[in-house]
């Protein structure tokens, strides 16, 4: 996403009450570069709001088998040492976590999922179940459509307005890496934040 598209996306969520609850998970995604399974697997014990640190040491994986196993979640640990890491939190990311906590408190939502001994997940749906990539991408597609429809209705296609492109959760990880590159961040630092063992 460009800077303008990224701003449009987050402004849209904040200005539309029915979508504001999605803001924290997507904001954290776009401002930490974490993989979607790392985000959905985050527990409150994995973050330190005082020190401003996110500890990444596991991934939540959703299996959709078309056999007797059916659909289920599992926890995986990183394949490489680089995958296990600490990510510094910006003030915006910290506020997103606090926003999520406040939203859940007001809506009387709490994590009810237990996966391979892991519980107290941060990002859960209204039933207290962990989120999965399919549901997050579905929410993205709907918000892209609604946002673009609203802009085109207001300004018309001839005005060449900023619109949201088609994108997925994984694109938010790329967007984070792009913003780091644009800021002149050291490649080794980018590699460590993203959890890559080798530079591409």
Where are these regions (language model features)?
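Basic, Lys/Arg- and aromatic-enriched nucleic-acid-binding interface segment
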Residues: 1-42, 50, 61, 82-84, ...
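C-terminal catalytic core of Y-nucleophile DNA break-rejoin enzymes
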Residues: 2, 55, 64-65, 75-99, ...
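Short, basic (Lys/Arg/His-rich) helix/loop patches that form interaction surfaces
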Residues: 7, 11-22, 32, 87, ...
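Flexible loop/turn segments at secondary-structure boundaries
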Residues: 35, 62-64, 131, 200
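Residues in the helix-turn-helix
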Residues: 38, 53-55, 189, 200
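A short, basic/aromatic helix-end/turn motif that makes direct DNA contacts
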Residues: 41-47, 191-197
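Short secondary-structure boundary/capping segments
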Residues: 46, 76-79, 112-113, 161
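Short, flexible, mixed-charge acidic loops at enzyme active sites
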Residues: 60-74, 112-113
């Amino acid at each position: 996403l460009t800077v303008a598209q990224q701003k449009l996306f987050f402004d849209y969520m904040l200005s539309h009450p029915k979508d504001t609850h999605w803001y924290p998970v997507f904001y954290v995604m776009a401002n930490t570069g974490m993989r979607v399974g790392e985000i959905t697997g985050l527990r409150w014990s994995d973050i330190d709001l005082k020190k401003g640190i996110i500890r990444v040491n596991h991934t939540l994986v959703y299996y959709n088998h078309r056999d007797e196993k059916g659909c289920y979640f599992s926890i995986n640990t990183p394949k490489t040492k680089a995958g296990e890491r600490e990510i510094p939190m910006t003030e915006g990311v910290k506020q997103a976590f606090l926003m999520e906590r406040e939203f859940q408190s007001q809506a009387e939502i709490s994590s009810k999922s237990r996966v391979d001994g892991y519980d107290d997940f941060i990002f859960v749906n209204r039933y207290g179940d962990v989120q999965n990539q399919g549901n997050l991408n579905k929410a993205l597609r709907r918000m892209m459509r609604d946002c673009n429809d609203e802009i085109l209705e207001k300004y018309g296609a001839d005005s060449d307005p900023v619109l949201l492109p088609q994108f997925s959760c994984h694109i938010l990880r790329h967007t984070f890496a792009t913003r780091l590159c644009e800021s002149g961040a050291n490649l080794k630092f980018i590699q460590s934040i993203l959890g890559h063992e080798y530079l591409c």
